[in-house]
Amino acid sequence: MAMGAVALSVGVLAACSSGGSSTPSAGAAGPASTGPITIGASLSLHGGFSADGVAFQQGYELWAKDVNAHGGLLGRQVKLKILDDDSSPTQVVTNYQMLINSDHVDLTFGPFSSLLTAPASQVAARAGYAFVEGAGGAPSVFDTPANQADHNVFDVSLPVEDTIMPFVDYLGSLPVSARAHLSAAYPMAQDPFADPPVQLAKQKLQALGIRTDSSPAIANPFPEQPSSYGPAALAVAALHPEIVVLGSTDVPTVQEFMKVFAQKHYTPKMFIAAAGPDQGAAFTSAVGAGNAVGMMVPNGWFPLFNNAASKKMVDEYVQLHGGTKSGVNADVAEAYSVGQVAAQAIQATGGTDNTAIIKYLHSGVPLATVQGSVQFNSLGENGAAASFVFQWQRHKTGSQVDFVQVLPQGVAGTGSILATKPAWDTTGPAGG
């Protein structure tokens, strides 16, 4: 009995010394660790976010492949453990609980979407894990009590609220007479990622004198489910606004709006979506290259980004998966950047101690990724990220389309914006 009591006391001491976490080491590695560094992530390989989830998996795996080809991190190979959350906020919580409490992974990487990142990050916070992610930039992710208390979330990508501002600034640069007759509609899916940038754009465009067209069907965000997209799109088409600012999270949402607009023979002069058109070939193959022309989307990265590491990653991706450079999904770069930031933190701290990694990432140190510079503020947002607007445009020759940086104007790499969207090709996928 005495021996049993001693053993129990040691166990309690170990737990207390780690802050009482259910995973006492929180991924800490001793100085003699030589085994693989295991990184756990939950991704949407099925369900509504599956196109993004698969692209994120490809990005994580490409990063791990590159790291391991160069000897790993601190002489240790990287091993990924990825679970499928079926695009479910409930399942994502279960998955991270399993990765941390059962699999005892060293580190955790984030899922796709702010909707899943917010609850997932709270699981990581309770266990003392850093949560480096690339697709959870909504304010709701950083405003959680867990992040306010533990400051464990780090988003390597662009914060979402200001993403559409280059488009707003472009319209604001037009003569008052040119925008006086313009009207805009702001349909939004009920999603923490999709809504904030559209709500801010609406507020700013109204202040510029651009009239808001609305109806009961789009006065409030619609449920993020396929059965809701059609009625909302029909309501917009009936209003015939010159500008559509769509709060979307994925390709299917944008595709349905485009399909309904084509069926109703309504083509907005300008159409920008919060997400979807940034998905490369996943978008153009779904809607048709001709229908993609003129579609705009904000982002902090594109496949032809003038960054040596980005170019190398894009070349590798095309070699592995085929397709064209313009068709590389932005999610791949976001996921790859998560790995790059984690790698720099592991190397700088000399291991996988999550407390040390959190402290390092909050130190204000500038980090380098395929998306550009990363520097985290006190909430874990990337304050160094720049916002751009991209547009699909016809290639100079042939039937190909290119993903072109068009805003802000006057910035290096910015091309001319196509100010009027061509009419829909009703024989293409979006017109079907």
Regions found by a protein language model. Name each.
Residues 11-15:
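C-terminal motif of bacterial Sec signal peptides marking the signal peptidase cleavage site
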Residues 18-28, 51-56, 71-146, 156, ...:
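Beta-alpha junction/loop-to-helix N-cap segments that form part of ligand/metal-binding clefts
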Residues 29-61, 83-90, 112-113, 187-196, ...:
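Extracytoplasmic "Venus flytrap"
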Residues 37, 365-432:
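Solvent-exposed, acidic/polar segments of extracytosolic/periplasmic ligand-binding ectodomains
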Residues 90-94, 139, 150-264, 304-312:
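Extracellular/periplasmic Venus flytrap/periplasmic-binding protein
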Residues 99-112, 131-134, 183-188, 240-250, ...:
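Periplasmic-binding protein-like
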Residues 150, 260-336, 413, 419-431:
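Extracellular/periplasmic periplasmic-binding protein-like sensory domains
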Residues 190, 250-256, 305-364:
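Extracellular/periplasmic ligand-binding modules, especially the Venus flytrap/periplasmic-binding
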